[in-house]
């Protein structure tokens, strides 16, 4: 039985907060616990901190792949960003200021608390980290925002609460300061019931992530605030600290999400039934699920990117989609469920002694209004099948049955050691240390079961900086698929042109050949693959038309209307330059 940090929202002390710096909501309800009690009792202060965790700690990114090239849209439900019809009202994250106010209240009172200095330091360090996290979530999406570092007092004069936007560079400077201040206060690690809290290693890893993001082409270093050298130094420091703490790549790759708190885990949201659970129904076939479908069905673009066992690229010109599952690296089998895969990753498969089969016995339309149309095989009874013929395996609770899809309890690993390592390697490449960058790629591939080959290069052919950069882009695509990192990568690398070049995302249609008998539930796909034909199919409702304008989001009109001092981004018709 695992003890986990309980990050459920408090019911006894809930501050009602200011929205977007200027809208006064209900006053704080202190009927159950008075403010003086909060800062005189470490347990209540910790409970107050826990609601910050509840609001800001990321969880399973279920369905997020549908909004990138990782997954295909369910029944051709292409979103407005990919259609090119999104507006500045399409993305509103400004509720984050609610969390910032909660944090600022804590920071404004913690130094006056009457419990031990050691406890005050730990609580303050965590709060500073989360303020940096919250501001990064805003600034990375919109550019500079108003920096509110003290809790504003409720008032009927809203003009006293309205603040202009700070420059992006000013915001990032403050984010980095909060991280540095947090790092000084946080312990090297938490233990026992506190495992899962933010510690020094998490803060250092996050600093590396932040600097990498703003050093990348989208923000291009912000005039020296986030240079590649600074990003390299931060990620190198994080890597060395984690190395000293015994962190590292965990093998096998397929067990990272099953073996909780393994050495690869850096930042984690802990789940356990019944205290803290999430719904995974939309991720798995309806035959073994209920109530939802269509999340994170892997795209053919993702499937094709996984390397072969010898490290070479999978190329459609020289290989057949009929045998796309032959001799791939270990990450392919740990992430991708394909027609007849022998990985019984669901309890329902094991109970019914079957594999998942995605083939059709007849197909009437390869490109219907909602996708593939025809008669699905009767072994896997899935009336709402995957449009790509693939399913996601990563971060699935393998212990629950159809009736328990609301009770999934797999920990969500937000930062893995592999990310810190690859952030370090990418920064090494950008600062001219190509040897270190290549060494990191080799480590990542070695853990994935890729063979070193005679030359010991694990199939990596890149030598020069531009080619190594492309190698990192491909490697991150497969290493971190369905972990909520892809859109951030596409934005910071300014790769929307690549998305448009796809025309559409794709899948495959697997059809049983005429005259061939159905397979048995546990037939060996390696011997029956030639009973099927495979056809590449488009999966979007329209061609991808995502605009470069979307690299940085516009400020929603409702937010602008509440504060006349806010200016719209210049890529959305305003005067504010989010790149400064």
Where are these regions (language model features)?
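Bacterial Sec-dependent N-terminal signal peptides
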Residues: 2-5, 14-41, 175, 208, ...
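Long, intrinsically disordered, low-complexity segments
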Residues: 96, 174-176, 255-311, 317, ...
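Active/binding-pocket-proximal capping segment
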Residues: 420-424, 431-454
């Amino acid at each position: 039985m695992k003890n986990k940090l309980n990050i459920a929202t408090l019911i006894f002390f809930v501050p009602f907060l200011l929205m977007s710096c200027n809208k006064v909501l209900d006053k704080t309800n202190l009927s159950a616990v008075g403010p003086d009690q909060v800062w005189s009792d470490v347990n209540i202060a910790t409970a107050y901190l826990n609601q910050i965790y509840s609001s800001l700690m990321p969880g399973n990114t279920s369905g997020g792949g549908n909004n990138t090239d990782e997954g295909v849209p369910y029944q051709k439900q292409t979103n407005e960003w990919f259609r090119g019809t999104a507006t500045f009202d399409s993305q509103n994250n400004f509720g984050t200021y609610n969390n910032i106010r909660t944090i600022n209240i804590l920071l404004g009172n913690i130094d006056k608390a009457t419990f031990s200095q050691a406890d005050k330091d730990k609580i303050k360090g965590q709060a500073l980290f989360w303020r940096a996290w919250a501001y990064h979530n805003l600034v990375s999406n919109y550019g500079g925002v108003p920096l509110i570092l003290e809790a504003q007092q409720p008032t009927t004069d809203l003009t006293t609460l309205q603040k202009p936007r700070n420059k992006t560079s000013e915001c990032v400077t403050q984010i980095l300061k909060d991280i540095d201040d947090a790092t000084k206060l946080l312990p090297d690690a938490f233990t026992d019931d506190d495992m899962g809290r933010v510690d020094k290693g998490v803060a250092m890893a996050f600093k590396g992530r932040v600097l990498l993001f703003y050093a990348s082409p989208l923000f291009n270093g912000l005039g020296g605030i986030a240079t590649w050298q600074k990003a390299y130094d931060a990620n190198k420091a994080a890597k060395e600290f984690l190395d000293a703490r015994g962190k590292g790549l965990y093998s096998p790759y397929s067990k990272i999400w099953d073996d909780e708190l393994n050495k690869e885990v850096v930042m984690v949201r802990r789940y356990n039934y019944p205290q803290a659970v999430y719904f995974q129904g939309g991720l798995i076939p309806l035959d073994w699920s209920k109530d939802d479908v269509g999340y994170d069905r892997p795209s053919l673009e993702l499937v094709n990117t996984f390397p072969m066992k010898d490290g070479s690229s999978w190329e459609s010109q020289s290989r057949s989609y009929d045998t796309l599952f032959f001799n791939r690296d270990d990450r392919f089998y740990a992430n991708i469920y394909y027609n007849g895969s022998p990985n019984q990753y669901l309890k329902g498969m094991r109970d019914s002694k079957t594999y998942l089969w995605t083939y059709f016995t007849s197909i009437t339309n390869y490109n219907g209004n909602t996708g593939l149309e025809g008669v699905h095989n009767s072994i896997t009874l899935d009336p709402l099948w995957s449009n790509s013929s693939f399913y996601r395996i990563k971060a699935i609770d393998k212990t629950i049955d159809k009736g328990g899809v609301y009770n999934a309890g797999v920990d969500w690993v937000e930062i893995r050691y592999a990310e810190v390592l690859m952030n370090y390697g990418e920064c090494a490449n950008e600062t001219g240390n190509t040897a270190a960058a290549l060494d990191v790629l080799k480590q990542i591939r070695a853990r994935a079961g890729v063979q070193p080959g005679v030359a010991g290069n694990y199939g990596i052919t890149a030598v020069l900086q531009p080619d190594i950069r492309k190698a990192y882009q491909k490697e991150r695509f497969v290493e971190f698929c369905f972990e909520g990192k892809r859109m951030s990568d596409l934005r910071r690398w300014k790769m929307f042109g690549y998305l448009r070049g796809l025309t559409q995302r794709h899948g495959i249609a697997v059809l049983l050949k005429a005259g061939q008998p159905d397979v048995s539930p546990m037939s060996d796909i390696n011997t029956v693959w030639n009973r099927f034909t495979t056809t590449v199919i488009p999966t979007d409702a329209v061609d991808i038309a995502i605009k470069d304008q979307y690299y940085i989001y516009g400020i929603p009109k409702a937010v602008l209307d509440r504060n006349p001092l806010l200016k719209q981004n210049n890529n959305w018709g305003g005067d504010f330059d989010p790149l400064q």
